[in-house]
Amino acid sequence: MFPMSSTSRSSAANNRKDPPRKKNKETPSPVTREPTSIDSLPNDLLLNCFARVSRMYYPALSRVSKRFRSIVTSPEIYNTRSLLNRTEKCLYLCLRFPFDNNTHWFTLYQNPNRTVSDKVFLQIPSPQYPLTLSSNLVAVGSNIYRIGGTVGDDSCPLGFDREPSSKVSILDCRSHTWRDGPRMRLNRRSSTTSVVDGKIYVTGGTEDTDNPSHWIEVFDPKTQSWGTVTNPHIVKVWEEVCYRRAVKSIGHDGKLYLSGDKYVVYDPDEGKWNSVEEHWLIGYAIGSSNCVVDNILFYWDQGVFKWYDSKVSSWKQLKGLEGLPDDFSQREYCKLVDLGGKMAVLWDKWEYSGVCMIFCAEISLEKRDGDEIWGKVEWFDTVLEVGASCSLKSADALSASV
């Protein structure tokens, strides 16, 4: 082979084609997506989301838009809460003011404008019924029942010339609307009312001339009907007509406890009355602020919380409770309410400015060592301010499941 000349080498180099270069792939520019607004979600998805949120936030949600308000006030949301097992105990307060023919109703809600406990009582619609004095309030499920009392001339709010009533009014705590319920067989005022296994037992508050076989009536919310229970005859019959019997009741452990001239207990399963041997034990709770939480009876008296240990038939002091105000033990009275495994405590305090401050504490309960219960103060704060003429002592506090 002959050697290639420099000129030929140069020509060959110039004629040689470079290998094709790989083209760089263009990097796609990032796609900017608009954030999804919760308001753009369909109603059924919003309802499912809101049903999982505590009912205490519903007033704040209802202020966002008319659409949100429509969802959180719909019957469907409470049906969904029940299916999702998201029902909760909500606290209600009924206040009465001197020389005022109206009752004032409040429920505890979350307040986004507060920075401590973020909870406050908000007023809800009151019934458009004539004022009923000496009535009883009791809650079953999502309803609050106002039973009996006196009706008459509204210009005489102290109760003169007023007649006892068999009327029953029902507050639906899901919609905050009132309706009439089935009337009792007898007119009553200043009776005592307790709940046992979902049924309402109304005792006393009748005239001596009334049928004694109807002295105790029992209402079944499922069948919306009234029945009677055998009269245990625990009060003396006086010659004069007397409405205000010294009869008190407590529903506990599936039984109805009554105190009158003696202490008795009624077992609905057996359908009979028995004497209470340790009557003074139950008497402590009946005469004081009390409530039942997870089938355990609690009461408060003279600054001390106690619970009833049914295993040893003895009252024991509730331990812990650090965080309550220093002067709490000096309160004359307070209200105890079941909050579904926890306990709400309400008390009031008068200020020199002429204002009555209503406080609330939420206490979680824990069993320790088998025979002790400890309470932990989750929070406490002022939840309502009213005029000094109002007193929590004459108020009613209770909870409903919604």
From Swiss-Prot:
Keyword terms: Kelch repeat, Repeat
The biased composition feature labelled Low complexity covers 1-14
UniProt key word Nuclease: no
Domain F-box stretches = 35-81
Stored InterPro entries: F-box-like_dom_sf, F-box/kelch-repeat_ARATH, F-box_dom, Kelch-typ_b-propeller, Kelch_1
Q: Pfam families recorded for this chain?
A: F-box, Kelch_FKB95
**Biased-composition ranges for Polar residues?**
27-37
Q: Where are the Kelch repeats?
A: 143-198, 199-246, 255-300, 302-341
Q: Which domain of life is it from?
A: Eukaryota
Span list, region Disordered: 1-37
Q: What is this protein called?
A: F-box/kelch-repeat protein At4g39590
Question: Which species does this protein come from?
Answer: Arabidopsis thaliana (Mouse-ear cress)
